[in-house]
Amino acid sequence: MAGLYSSSSSSKPTLSSSPSSSSSSRLFLLVTLLPLSLACFAFVLQWRGGLDDPVTHWSIDHHEFPGMVTTQEKRSLRRSVSDSGCVDLLGQSRSPSFPYFRNWKFDYHSDLKPRICITTSTSAGLEQTLPWIYFHKVIGVSTFYLFVEGKAASPNVSRVLETIPGVKVIYRTKELEEKQAKSRIWNETWLSSFFYKPCNYELFVKQSLNMEMAITMAQDAGMEWIIHLDTDELIHPSGTHEYSLRKLLGNISADVDVVIFPNYESSVERDDIREPFSEVSMFKKNFDHLLRDVYFGNYKDATRGNPNYFLTYGNGKAAARVQDHLRPNGAHRWHNYRKSPNEVKLEEAAVLHYTYPRFSDLTSRRDRCGCKPTKVDVKRCFMLEFDRAAFIIASTASSEEMLQWYREHVVWTDEKLKLKLLRKGILTRIYAPMVIIQELREAGVFSSVVIAAHKSPSKNSSTADSTSGITRESSQETGKRRVLEFHLDVDGESQASAVPPQSPPGLEATQMEL
């Protein structure tokens, strides 16, 4: 028995060790196979050959994802671009792009609140208007009222603009001018000091009349906010986590009628800028967003011998809540016929003004104005000192002299000065608009809009053609007519003079206080 007992007891460890060795083998097998499985899975994920993904057929790119171009292909792309000697401002980037956003319409519907619209008066081409429109669509603008003339009203440009969801194109026809000639504005005093003058004054009156019409359109469309912007300006909705203008205006108190966006001015660092929205990242801050001591303490350095702190205006732009009796108060502000609007000024958000960002802007502005290049005559045509000086230079100097003047007065080439003013906070880097517009371009949004528009029949080609027949003289009639048709029951406060473009505070402001 003892032997049997000892024999049986000695066999127990052998029986118990069998399951232990089996589990160890399984664990070893698992540890061995798991890395191999993960490696195989990773290989399958990054494998570029063999399988044909039907989704990739939607893309016209040979490579569907960024990073899938070989070194040899990159060299050939660079060679082809350099050989052509031109840059495709509207088309696809020469680098690979993510293909699934092509035909991205940004067709916002009425359920998105608040509903925001922008109105502008423009003669710019597609290379400027398309990035401008789609950038503002990205940040939450749903509707655009484009009062077009010149290049913007040409058939090749207008037919593209008409196909964009949310864009309303208004041509400067004789019918429009006759309608605006009957505006109540001509019987009021707040804009009267700008009547009967050429160039910038004429444009200022025209913008105000267009803004008045845009208010009516915005009311009919159920818009909640309206903003007047030029096509060389972008809203910068800083201060919101989502970089959203809709979020920004949605948080405004219900008793606020007007929201003022201080403007920042572009500070270009090269004289060969082609596409400002994608190439300019440095801006000069507005007085309203700086400490007083910082502003005046660095005023001379920031001005660099120019007439004012900003090259052009410094009083920003404004968004108005769409409501009864709203009226424009010049291109920069809004007013109300029945009350003084409750205004707030934003502490972080701004309007980015791309001021003379291209050397060619000197001559293009000159060509739009028939003013004589004398110090006396330019005061009739331009409101701001820098515009006057730029017009005289563009009208009298040689190309070499113009370029030298442009480099001295507009381009920031002094690296030490830039670094100093960046540290002081006078200058700042803003990359969001650049990134958004570059991504839209690389996604093929702009090129697909142009291609789609030219494949479809034009909606209003006859209107565009008739617009091109309107002479400059008939257009100038807008600033010279005054039709007295209304007896207005308005108080004196509602007749406050229109707010023109104004320069920022100068050093004389501190001397006056002393």
Curated annotation (Swiss-Prot):
Example GO BP: response to abscisic acid
Residues carrying sugar: N156, N187, N251, N460
Disulfide bonds: none
Ranges of biased composition (kind: Polar residues): 458-473
PANTHER family on file: GLYCOSYLTRANSFERASE FAMILY 92 PROTEIN (PTHR46701:SF6), GLYCOSYLTRANSFERASE-LIKE KOBITO 1 (PTHR46701)
Family membership noted in the UniProt record: Belongs to the glycosyltransferase 25 family.
The protein's name: Glycosyltransferase-like At3g57200
Species of origin: Arabidopsis thaliana (Mouse-ear cress)
Lineage: Eukaryota, Viridiplantae, Streptophyta, Embryophyta, Tracheophyta
